């Protein structure tokens, strides 16, 4: 944010300045440190407005979110052609899950259900469109909804959102331990060791 002109500072390739949507996760964790229910009540309309803006601006008919891959902050990764970044979509699921949890804190069953439903919708789409059984990994999608076969650290974000079932999670853990993919001396490389890049 530029204080001299009160304007957001954005990148050419990310004009909306979208980043990973993690505000509900942050508020949930803050609540568990402070137990300030009033803050949740006050911030919830802002969080809802933010989620609605993301839906209105970036959600596509396939149920996934098409954002610039720069939104992930991983601009050093070879993700050219990525239109549906797996990390952003996993974060949307994660944020929806925490929005539901915040609804529970407020004893708002309707709100909780709305975001729980959203979570499962995104989870289903990430699993059906971004998961590859052959390689046991989650991938970004291109504009044609085809998987980009570049294994990046972004493919592990679905685990944080509890998207994979036990079998898929085991495949991801195997990649973390596999010296041919992500099991390197310096853990969690941006790219898989067998990357074509």
Describe every region a protein language model picked out.
Residues 1-64, 85-89, 93:
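Aromatic-rich carbohydrate-recognition surfaces in CAZymes
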Residues 1-14, 56-84, 124-197:
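Extended glycan-interaction surfaces of carbohydrate-active proteins
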Residues 15, 80-94, 111-114, 118, ...:
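Short, contiguous, pocket-lining structural segments
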Residues 22-39, 90-109, 157-168:
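Well-ordered alpha-helical scaffold segments within catalytic/enzyme domains
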Residues 31, 50-53, 115, 138, ...:
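Aromatic side chains
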Residues 47, 112-130:
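Short amphipathic alpha-helical coiled-coil/interface segments
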